[in-house]
Amino acid sequence: MAKLGVRSLKEMVGRTDLLVATDAVDEPHKGKVDLSAILNNPYAKAGSEVTFDPKAEYNFQLEKTLDEKVLVKKCSRAIHGGEKTRFSVEVKNTDRAFGTILGAEITRNNKNGLPEDTVEIDCTGAGGQSFGAFIPKGLTLKLTGDCNDYFGKGLSGGKLILKTPENAGYKAEDNIIVGNVALYGATSGTAFINGMAGERFAVRNSGANAVVEGVGEHGCESVSYTHL
């Protein structure tokens, strides 16, 4: 470490500029792999910080999410006065944790949630990771399309409906419509999935109920107090 010019293991983290590709390799592809893009680190050479600083300010750009731009604003009367609200929105697979910020606002202002289906949001498209994660009672998300991993993670009283498009051209019951680890750690609420789910469906579910038309490996492990 002293020869490398570092005083601790922490100082070595991220210092790929200290690594050199060895020539002591006896195999036919020797010299055919260019590692310069991996090993070159101009920041380290310039003396800049190359490791993550946990004290650095987080900036997740939440103001750019659909929750902040659309959902919370449209649901203001429901959040603060319990007014029934329903509208449609198009989602894409980069819209992660769709509905989670809205759910947090509902819970912040209504500790026991809202009456069932107070807020109904009809979505179309491809849901991103953690679609409907942690949503509370009173919030219903309906998605016509498909969804990525962690659908309904930590579901906390809300309702999720995932439907195969009518013009899909395939049988819903024979095709995966939602990714892995759907409903992981859910504690209450319901989910209806018009198709199959991927691996580890509803693992550690302890109270949420769900209907699905098939699951992959390791589905329903460590579940309790639930109907699946």
Each model region followed by its residue ranges:
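Terminal amphipathic helices with adjacent charged low-complexity linkers/tails
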Residues: L9-Q61
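Conserved small/polar residues in nucleotide/adenosyl-binding loops
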Residues: T226-H227
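Conserved structured catalytic cores and adjacent interaction surfaces
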Residues: V181, A186, A191-F192, N205, ...
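The right-handed parallel beta-helix/beta-solenoid scaffold, focusing on the short coil/turn
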Residues: D117-V119, K137-L139, F151, G158, ...
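Short, T/G/N/S-enriched strand-turn elements that build extracellular solenoid repeat scaffolds
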Residues: N110-N112, Q129-I135, C147-L155, N180-L183, ...
